[in-house]
């Protein structure tokens, strides 16, 4: 979750209509299907952002969001409160979040590194009680910024903020009122927060839910500073859109590796690793698993100005070692859909299968060889032809 001035916009409370899909057995291509004369460039399948905030568009505003590549210098501050003083050491808190750095490095193929620093391992006393900071769902940007400003001011005598790109603010366990973990994204149009001559642009303010979600909550919230939206639903059934596929959905899901679409948006995979079909025709693509570096990562069929279908190969390894299903993951992307309203919909290849313990129905969504997806609204189809340890081969077509 993020807070921003834009959160005051009116949000639709209607639940998105169910995505119509046909799941069939793949058939041999007909004689009328034609491969394009020359492969399309990936740019032809890149979608523009239309929400003015975190979304699935490729034109991420780098004045608002930080780049997702390179080293990110993260300052960790440990805070307690007059009404909730800490009685334990900060060591366990630092150790709890430390694995987030390795997870991000693996997820990004080494292209994004979190240098999580803890130069001051003492508790920093906040000026106000924990109950005064309004940590409820729907917290306003102004209220959230006050919390961050107070933490920065209290820590300023002890650390040099000019040495860091972003801040993690970690509360004592005694501060039950600091319940959840929103991300602070600065507003360039306001004076904001400055310390040591440096404008503080990004901060993750952890809450007590960090102990329930585990260290990956840091990777999820840091993803918002890169411009990624929430893939879980803000209303209704929380995980109906993507379930445990992608960390921006269910943080504790069994297959949290970022979607290949997100890796492309963030610059972790190159245009040469994207197979694009923007116009009519067919194309056969050999996909390598998104959990590994190298090879073609996503096959994209563009269906409109802001919409596309994406196919990618998933395997139970690395960050996805607990995946409930493997094969080809197919999903619809809409870059005009706001965060929390379902900008990504995963297509379930096995809707009638009962999931085992620890898995949700949509966690079994991966397509196997011989299965096919057709969208009745657009006529596009994706057939899974082959699969094996090295990846999957799909044939995608557009009338």
Q: Where do the protein language model's features map onto the residues?
A:
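Zn2+-dependent metallopeptidase catalytic core
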Residues: 33-210, 219, 371-373, 379-386
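Short, solvent-exposed loop/turn segments at the edges of secondary structure
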Residues: 71, 241-243, 325
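Secretory targeting and sorting signals
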Residues: 1-32
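Extracellular hydrolytic enzyme modules, especially secreted metalloproteases
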Residues: 161, 166-168, 174-320
